[in-house]
Amino acid sequence: DKIPDFVVPGKCASVDRNKLWAEQTPNRNSYAGVWYQFALTNNPYQLIEKCVRNEYSFDGKQFVIKSTGIAYDGNLLKRNGKLYPNPFGEPHLSIDYENSFAAPLVILETDYSNYACLYSCIDYNFGYHSDFSFIFSRSANLADQYVKKCEAAFKNINVDTTRFVKTVQGSSCPYDTQKTL
């Protein structure tokens, strides 16, 4: 058996989850709305390659997510998920998409109206972990000043920002069609 390439030696980054949780909980509903995926690190669970558009609807307790875009095979794809407070009381969110498993998610930094920097990590036995990072934008493009804010947030927890790959967005994307999926 071979260890998947996204499972690497080391531990998850040290994040002050309690501080972030306390700051973000009162503003959680502000996270609702449309977010475009601007960039991400290698993630075998992200089945949508291009034009990634996420709609977050808040019901007072959790977000229902509709993610759409173009899959690796070139076809439109819709995935349904949920984002909710960790059910065991830990100070982070859990993200759970259909045909996957729930994973911890921390919003490292956001202003709720332009950008969000997201980090997910799971520690395994024997000193291994998997971490996945995302940069989201409220529009198909993201101003450099906000990209720099996310880069600084990730560097602050020692995530190598050269791991990020920009997501194709823009005029070649069928956003109007995606909205109807």
UniProtKB/Swiss-Prot annotation:
Q: Where in the cell is it found?
A: Secreted, Extracellular space
CDD domains per the UniProt record, alphabetical: lipocalin_crustacyanin (cd19436)
Its tissue distribution reads: Found in the carapace.
GO CC annotation terms, alphabetical? cytoplasm; extracellular region
Superkingdom classification of source: Eukaryota
Q: Which InterPro entries match?
A: Calycin, Invtbrt_color, Lipocalin_ApoD, Lipocln_cytosolic_FA-bd_dom
**Keyword flag GTP-binding:** no
Q: Which Cys residues form disulphide pairs?
A: C12-C121, C51-C173, C117-C150
Pfam families found in the cross-reference section = Lipocalin (PF00061)
UniProt keyword list: Disulfide bond, Pigment, Secreted, Transport
Q: Which GO terms describe its biological process?
A: lipid metabolic process; response to reactive oxygen species
Could you state a single Gene Ontology molecular function term?
pigment binding
Q: How does it assemble?
A: Oligomer; Can form dimers (beta-crustacyanin); or complexes of 16 subunits (alpha-crustacyanin). There are five types of subunits: A1, A2, A3, C1 and C2.
The record's comment on protein family reads: Belongs to the calycin superfamily. Lipocalin family.
What does the function comment of this entry state?
Binds the carotenoid astaxanthin (AXT) which provides the blue coloration to the carapace of the lobster.
Know the name of this protein?
Answer: Crustacyanin-C1 subunit
Say which species the protein is native to.
Homarus gammarus
